[in-house]
Regions:
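A general structural signal for stabilizing positions within well-ordered secondary structure
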Residues: 1, 38-41, 83, 111, ...
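Extracellular loop and loop/strand-boundary signature of outer-membrane beta-barrel proteins
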Residues: 65-67
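Conserved ATPase-coupling elements of RecA-like P-loop NTPase cores
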Residues: 58-63, 103-104
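Conserved S-adenosyl-L-methionine
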Residues: 1-51, 56-58, 96-98, 141
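A generic fold-level signal
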Residues: 2, 43, 72, 133-136
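Short, structurally constrained coil/turn elements
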Residues: 3, 25, 113-114, 134
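Conserved Class I SAM-dependent methyltransferase catalytic core
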Residues: 10-19, 69-129, 136-143
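Flexible, glycine-/basic-rich loop-and-beta segments that form/coincide
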Residues: 129-192
Length: 192
């Protein structure tokens, strides 16, 4: 399988990209230094996409009039990854918890129209503090793109539930945390 595989690596940082090219370019890896948003990629051709999507409340200049064209950067990356993924392919990404916990389920609904959630893990608080100097709460999400006409799996991950925040009370009133229903049904996937 490895001999028949083609790997494309996209790295925004020039120094990291040059290191990547130096290490793997001779092995046939197509290393592209630049942003994923500027990369020319054939749609429906990749079997597996791995990404640590950028976190932020800014968008991408995308004039292609796609359902995610005006989405935040992390949601845009997920939408674009699904475009270049072939049916049956997997996308595995680390993103902020806002993708699964956002009160507006519009982007999740768009994703669910094309792909099924295979699994997700809520990573422990502070996972990236030491190595990336960020305290953002993150999820590891795996999606599988469906073939045209393939029935969708149940999509409980479109909805949110309110669960009590342990140890947090305001007077006599319990406070609640809004969390994706998938994690309420799969608490063993909440690692922190």
């Amino acid at each position: 399988v490895a001999q028949r595989s083609r790997v494309t690596a996209i790295e925004l940082d020039r120094i990291s990209g040059r290191i990547l090219r130096s290490l793997y370019g001779a092995c046939g890896v197509d290393v592209r230094i630049g942003g994923f948003e500027a990369a020319t990629l054939a749609e429906g051709t990749y079997d597996l996409i791995l990404s640590n999507v950028p976190f932020g409340r800014y968008g991408v200049l995308d004039n292609r009039n796609r359902p995610y064209s005006r989405a935040s950067i992390h949601n845009w990356f997920v939408g674009r990854a699904l475009d270049v993924l072939r049916p049956g392919g997997l996308v595995c990404f680390i993103t902020s918890t806002y993708f699964l916990d956002e009160s507006d389920a519009g982007m999740r609904a768009h994703v669910a129209s094309e792909a099924d959630l295979v699994t997700a893990f809520r990573l422990p608080s502070g996972t990236f503090e030491r190595i990336a100097s960020t305290s953002v709460q993150a999820d590891l999400v795996v999606l599988r793109k469906r073939a045209p006409g393939e029935a969708a799996a149940p999509a409980e991950w479109l909805d949110l539930d309110y669960v009590p925040k342990p140890m947090l009370r305001e007077g006599c009133h319990e406070q609640y945390l809004r969390i994706n229903r998938w994690f309420v049904s799969h608490p063993e996937h909440v690692l922190g």
